[in-house]
């Protein structure tokens, strides 16, 4: 789906969203996503991704979901088919740190540059509302990929944070896979 043949991967905001515009439910709950899609539902996206930059809250939610999957909770238990470098942007790295990820503090532009460099010419996937908002405000995003799920959550974390200025998008594709509608937009710069 993404062109990485030039060796200049894109910065892609990637998120699942309820029909009423929420990317997470109350309490940052995201396990509802697995009611509609498995973590490995789109292997071509994982194959085009060279690195991920996530926010601390998204990282913590992911850890809780993975722990729940190991115990057989509502999460699917299937692994996301991505094994590249993961960067977590945070004000306070955990103590002790998680050896599986690189914690970054500081400027969003520097964080994107470092993670993009580690992506090896593939896409840098941005996860997390706050980090995505910072990237969008700074004009660092090339594409937005949205998986629209057939559910109304009613409350939670919105797709974009208040105060984000208008950003014009160019539709690239619209496809459907099972219950999921996949929308891809290019950010007009």
Predicted feature locations:
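Enzymes that bind and transform nitrogen-containing heteroaromatic metabolites
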Residues: 1-189
């Amino acid at each position: 789906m993404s062109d990485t043949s030039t060796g200049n991967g894109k910065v892609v905001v990637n998120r699942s969203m309820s029909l009423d515009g929420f990317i997470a439910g109350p309490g940052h709950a995201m396990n509802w996503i697995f009611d509609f899609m498995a973590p490995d539902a789109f292997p071509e996206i994982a194959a085009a991704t060279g690195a991920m930059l996530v926010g601390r809250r998204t990282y913590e939610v992911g850890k809780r979901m993975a722990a729940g999957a190991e115990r057989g909770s509502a999460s699917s238990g299937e692994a996301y088919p991505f094994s590249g470098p993961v960067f977590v942007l945070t004000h306070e790295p955990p103590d002790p740190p998680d050896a599986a990820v690189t914690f970054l503090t500081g400027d969003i532009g520097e964080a994107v540059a470092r993670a993009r460099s580690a992506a090896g010419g593939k896409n840098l996937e941005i996860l997390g509302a706050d980090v995505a908002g910072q990237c969008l405000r700074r004009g660092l995003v090339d594409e937005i990929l949205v998986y629209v799920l057939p559910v109304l959550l009613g409350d939670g974390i919105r797709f974009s944070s208040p105060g984000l200025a208008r950003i014009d998008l160019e539709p690239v594709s619209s496809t459907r896979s099972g219950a999921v509608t996949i929308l891809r937009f290019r950010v007009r710069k």
